[in-house]
Design a protein with these regions (language model features):
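Conserved sequence signature across two-component system core domains
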Residues: 8-9, 34, 52
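Active-site residues of response regulator receiver
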Residues: 9, 55, 83
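Short hydrophobic/Thr-rich beta-strand motif most characteristic of the beta2 strand and flanking loop
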Residues: 27-35, 43
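Conserved acidic segment of CheY-like receiver
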Residues: 2-14, 18-22
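Active-site beta3 strand of CheY-like receiver
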Residues: 47-53
């Protein structure tokens, strides 16, 4: 059974590249893509993936705000943060809110 994934990133090339990599692996199914935090939260109301790949720096609602909303609404999803931010403060905030992994885009 494939792991259901949602990709949330404001860059369409990043979303498309991640989708292609995951689908080539074969054990993953990208069930949704979101271009910002608000879009992500709307799509989470429709269906909950097993894993959410989440960018931090996005317009309208950033990834840390999405993390807090997910925690507040008690949405059961594993979250991997993908970001260019390598500053410790972002990692600590994300870990404090509750993430399952933190990957740098470098």
């Amino acid at each position: 059974m494939a792991v259901k994934v949602m990709i949330t990133d404001d860059h369409s090339l990043i979303r498309e590249g991640l989708k292609q990599l995951l689908e080539l692996e074969g054990d993953f199914q990208v069930i949704a893509e979101a271009c910002d935090g608000i879009d992500c939260m709307e799509k989470l109301k429709e269906q909950i993936p097993d894993v959410l790949l989440l960018d931090i720096n996005m317009p309208r609602m950033n990834g840390l705000e999405v993390l807090q909303k997910i925690k507040d609404e008690k949405i059961d999803v594993k979250i991997l943060v993908l970001t260019v931010h390598n500053e410790v403060e972002y990692l600590l905030k994300a870990v404090d809110i509750g993430i399952n992994g933190y990957l740098l885009k470098d």
